[in-house]
Amino acid sequence: MSAWRRFLSHPKPWLLACLVLLAGLAGLAGLAGLVSPQMGLHAQSSAMILDPLKGLFNAPVPKEWLSQAYLLTSYQEDPKYLDSASSYSNNETPWTYAVYEPPLKYHYLKRPYELLPRTLVDMPLLTFFDKGGRPLKIDPSALKDQSEEVRAQIAQTVFELKIKPGIMFQPHPAFYKNAQGELGNLKLTPNDLQDIRSPLDFKTTGFRELNAYDYAYAIKRLATPRINSPAFGFLSTKIVGFDRFGEKIQKENQRLKALADQQGIPGQALPWLDFRAYDFEGVKVVDPYTLQIKISGLYPQFKYWLAMSFFAPVAWEVDAFYAQNGMAKRNLSANTWPVGTGPFMLTEHDTNSRMVLSKNPNYRGEPYPCEGSEEDLALGLLKDCGKPTPLLEKIISTREKEGTSVATKFIQGYYDMPQMERGEPGIAYQVSIQDGTGLSKELLERKIQLPATIQVGLWHYGFNWLDPVVGAGKTPEQAERNKKLRQAISIAFDFEEYVSIFENSRAQVNHSLVVPGLFGNDAMLFNPVVFDPDGAGRFKRKSIDEAKRLLAQAGYPGGIDRESGKALVINYDTQGVGPGAKTRIDWVSKQFAKLNIQLEVRNTDYNRFQDKMRKGSAQFYFWGWLADYPDPENFLFLLYGPNSKAKFGGENSSNFDNKRYDQLFEKMKDMENTPERAALIVQMMHIMQEEAPMLFGWSEEYGGAYHQWVRNGKPSNIIRDQMAYLNVEPTLRVQKISEWNRPVLWPFFLLPVLIALLLWPAVLVWRRRQDVSIAQGMNDVGQQKSGVST
């Protein structure tokens, strides 16, 4: 008889208990294994059942992360552009402003916003010149008080930047020098790159000091057609000679491309454009630590541009490194692996999975600010006064496609803040607490910090000016018809309803591009094309009947094209996934349905959407704009003709082109905030309201969400380098996560009992069968013995 059969026929209780216990553990482990960091949790009920087990067997983050000075968070969309010349989307800024350092920055705590030197010794020195190139004796600090005649004398403004000595680039293989002092990684072949997937795979790295040439190189590089920088179109009208320089680079690129075609070189391996070889009047390196930028006329807002990533330094070695044949094929570029002098460096970039920023070992440690408001003091935002930044060792951000998964992991404590690049969760949590719904109980009990501010930005819908149906029109008659169509749609879009439903009334409907918080916003109370005054100092949206009347005048009575007899169809380009996005799309369809206009929805991911907008192939679109700097010029340029996205790669997404508007903009943009400037802004408002190239949408609140162990969270869509100032208390984090995610042990003991109860009848049946078999066998043996004796 085998040992197993002997056990089943006479089981040892203690051994049976061990087997049942092992089976129970296997069952628990299998159940807990269903919850993986990749899968996330798809419902709150699932979380209630499985979270205790997950905490015991399979936490979504490694334990060692929790005890370190790591910030743990998530992101929704993989950033498409991390190159300082091309990056301009909100979801890219947490990384670009952590790695790159423009010359200026904003004081992290002060409001109103205050510009400060970042890599400079002091703020830029301004010198004014007349048309003859002679310097003017005008004090820049008293410029606002100068007469119009004196200001009109200014033909050029020179910004002089003095760079701090001793600032170092991060370690990178582009800077490696061999024993002979030669750069050793700039003559690589595709064969040399066979096992390379990131710059961290190189065994040799180096670094060097920042100098003025790096800033000059970065500015000149904005003109290359290989990158298509969204800043070049506008800056080419401001930096002296930049437009002609762009034309020169365009021709040089065409020459190199033709040469490559003749030699059979593929497009990804075009010869490197070395911008050290090309100079122009607007950018001058005086010495290794001094740079001069020459601006046409008077443009006070240029100082804000110097705080943007477009003006971050680019080392020529890095540009040459990524231009080598084979790099693009392996997705090695400044778009995926940026290089800078900032507080962090990108050390992990797994597409659609995870991105990690690690402390730059060469960073000089700029001190945390010691000045702030009484409120900042009360909130503990000055506790880290004077400490060298960054205060974190790493920022680990995981790609999350499902909002439910983000919310669950955040409430459990495994994410310190829900999302790296967006402020919507903070506002949503505030609404939840206000209404007593959702996670309100946990948010209050776990002391989640929910600071909020008014966002300097807007969400808007726009028409493509290049489109034959909703755009400019080729004849005056067509232009008038198209305008009436746009006006009718503008009236039909009930943003008051939208704000009430989707924003929980925590947003403000806009009447122009000049949003709340900007100079000139109070100069015009409402949009007279869309609203009527109600006689009590308020206003109300015009009726749908008025919109239908305009639609008929546009040639589409009842939504039918009078000429063709076919239904009017509008193509709507948008981006977004999930039930929330679908609900909003349904709302848009409902607005068009009021006019009996059919809507063709072309929903796509954000990267493809950006490509469509760059090509000018959209007809009607939805997008947002967050201010780069707190000045109306930064919004009014969204309709400036030379800033067209399709024509010049700028940020005029509607490709709006109106000569009068452009003239007013060119005059307004150079002015200080005076009554004269406000009057020009009002005229521009009238034009955009009458022509209706946009539906101005709404401006929403912007809020952060941080656990109690996160310090220094102060949300702002103007200040983009927040990551350098955030801090965590790992000990408190570990303690709270342990408290909140204690495993419920009764299933641990109950499951083996249940398994034992299920197994025991089977064991009894087996034993009975064995007893019968044994008895039968003994009987047979007895009979055989009896037969032998006979």
Segment roles from a protein language model:
Residues 107-110, 240-290, 294-405, 544-545, ...:
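Gly/Pro-rich hinge or "lid" segments in bacterial periplasmic/extracellular proteins
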Residues 344-345, 493, 508-554, 574-584:
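Structural transition elements
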Residues 347-358, 383-384, 396-470, 496, ...:
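Extracellular/periplasmic solute-recognition and catalytic clefts
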